[in-house]
From Swiss-Prot:
GO biological process, one term: proteolysis involved in protein catabolic process
Originating species: Desulforapulum autotrophicum (strain ATCC 43914 / DSM 3382 / VKM B-1955 / HRM2)
SMART domains xrefs: AAA, ClpB_D2-small, zf-C4_ClpX
Residues annotated to bind Zn(2+): 13, 16, 35, 38
Sorted UniProt keywords: ATP-binding, Chaperone, Metal-binding, Nucleotide-binding, Zinc
Protein name, entry field: ATP-dependent Clp protease ATP-binding subunit ClpX
GO molecular function: ATP binding; ATP hydrolysis activity; ATP-dependent protein folding chaperone; protein dimerization activity; unfolded protein binding; zinc ion binding
Domain of life: Bacteria
GO CC annotations on file: HslUV protease complex
Family as reported in the entry's similarity comment: Belongs to the ClpX chaperone family.
Binding site for ATP: 120-127
Residue stretches making up the ClpX-type ZB domain: 1-54
Function: ATP-dependent specificity component of the Clp protease. It directs the protease to specific substrates. Can perform chaperone functions in the absence of ClpP.
Subunit and interaction comment: Component of the ClpX-ClpP complex. Forms a hexameric ring that, in the presence of ATP, binds to fourteen ClpP subunits assembled into a disk-like structure with a central cavity, resembling the structure of eukaryotic proteasomes.
Length: 418
């Protein structure tokens, strides 16, 4: 009901309760009034909701070029330019193919190009796939190939990968069928000739065979509530032919396979002799051929479903320092934001950043290991800081990283005295 003060003959806003003297305008309706302030507030709320609802559609409808896709990857992933170019072109062609199939019904069928990423731990393989999925606003699922087994053995069925994607799409099947799946550690399911357990291959070549169909494109039957299949259960049908599969692995020792092939071809008089130490692993991986991956242990049928192959280089100390500071969600920026909640400025010296990068190289953990090193460095600081009053800046130096010594704290009192 509209409030009206009979004695003063004043009208009140039906929403906020302010009278006509407290606002600029009071608009009358059928037995109700609304003030100009509430109208402005309603406009802001509607505008914000429209932006949120339209943003995903605009992102998915916009025709992004490979260059624009790479520009987005550049803001989150340091270096690895060739891998980012390969991914950008592959993703661009993949979704262009899906759009073309909707608009055209001619006889030309363009097959999808799944991707194989080869590189050491912590070089950015998983992050590249995650960033693509987030930016393109498509569902994303991450799977570990080492947990997969053939049907009939204890372990994860390969179709559970599709189930994870459907769950991440909130069971929107149409949306899930345009998603991205990243399968990590595919090098661990390789079948090598010298494998002592070749007679019982539970999670090696058998898993490669099981992955063939869903990667190439098939109709997978997914239990709606997860878990193992039951005969009485109603299955959800998911078409995988439009799902982009990105596989990744470290492939430790692959460079030796490549080197052996190159050495055999370069034997004889006049051949250039180069020691193994002089040969860079990254340079060897650039000379990768499908036959090398087959000798490593991937079966030809599985490799044939991954036509786009690219390698990522190992990150050196300079690259790791950039990863700490430059990306949009850089680790240092995350901790600085945490310290801002305490009204404290967090500063790392160049020596401290270099020490963290050097430790990550020593551990051979790449960018993934930087968070663990940062946590170790910051544990005592973050434990003591909330109990310490009037701190305005925390300066972390090299000794804090290497010897876990206390950081330099600057207090508000020192600022006032100065």
């Amino acid at each position: 009901m509209t409030r009206k003060d009979d004695e003063s003959d004043q009208f009140f806003c039906s929403f906020c309760g302010k009278n006509q003297k407290e606002v600029k305008k009071l608009i009358a309706g059928p037995s109700v009034y609304i003030c100009n302030e509430c109208v402005s507030l309603c406009e802001e709320i509607i505008e914000d909701e429209d932006k949120e609802s339209l943003a995903p559609a605009e992102a998915s409808d916009k025709k992004l070029t490979p260059r624009e896709i790479k520009d987005v990857l550049d803001t989150y992933v340091i270096e690895q330019d060739r891998a980012k170019k390969v991914l950008s072109v592959a993703v661009y062609n993949h979704y262009k193919r899906l759009d073309a199939e909707v608009k055209s019904e001619d006889d030309v069928e363009i097959q999808k190009s799944n991707i194989l990423l080869i590189g050491p731990t912590g070089c950015g393989k998983t992050l590249l796939a995650q960033t693509l999925a987030r930016f393109l606003d498509v569902p994303f699922a991450l799977a570990d190939a080492t947990t997969l087994t053939e049907a009939g053995y204890v372990g994860e069925d390969v179709e559970n990968i599709i189930l994870s994607l459907v769950q991440n799409a909130d069971y929107d099947i149409e949306k899930a069928q345009r998603g991205i799946i990243y399968i990590d550690e595919v090098d661990k399911i390789s079948q090598r000739g010298d494998n002592p357990s070749i007679t019982r291959d539970v999670s090696g070549e058998g898993v490669q065979q099981a992955l063939l169909k869903i990667i190439e494109g098939t109709t997978a039957s997914i239990p709606p509530k997860g878990g193992r299949k039951h005969p009485q259960q109603d299955f959800v049908k998911v078409e995988t032919s439009n799902i982009l599969f990105v596989c990744g692995g470290t492939f430790t020792g692959l460079e030796k396979v490549i080197e052996r092939r190159i050495s055999q071809k370069s034997m004889g008089f006049g051949a250039e002799v180069q020691s193994r130490k002089e040969k860079n692993v990254g340079e060897l991986l650039e000379q990768l051929k499908p036959e090398d991956l087959i000798k490593f242990g991937l079966i030809p049928e599985f490799l044939g479903r991954l036509p786009v192959v690219t390698s990522l280089s190992e990150l050196n100390e300079a690259s790791l320092v950039k990863i700490l500071t430059e990306p949009k969600n850089a680790l240092l920026k995350q901790y600085q934001r945490l310290f801002e909640f305490e009204n404290v400025k967090l500063t790392f010296t160049e020596e401290a950043l270099a020490a963290m990068a050097k430790e990550a190289v020593t551990r051979r953990s790449g960018a993934r290991g930087l968070r663990a090193i940062m946590e170790e460095t910051m544990l005592d600081i973050m434990y003591e800081l909330p109990s310490t009053e009037n701190v305005r800046e925390c300066i972390v130096g090299e000794e804090v990283v290497l010897k876990h010594e206390p950081p330099i704290l600057l207090f508000e009192q020192a600022k006032k005295q100065a």
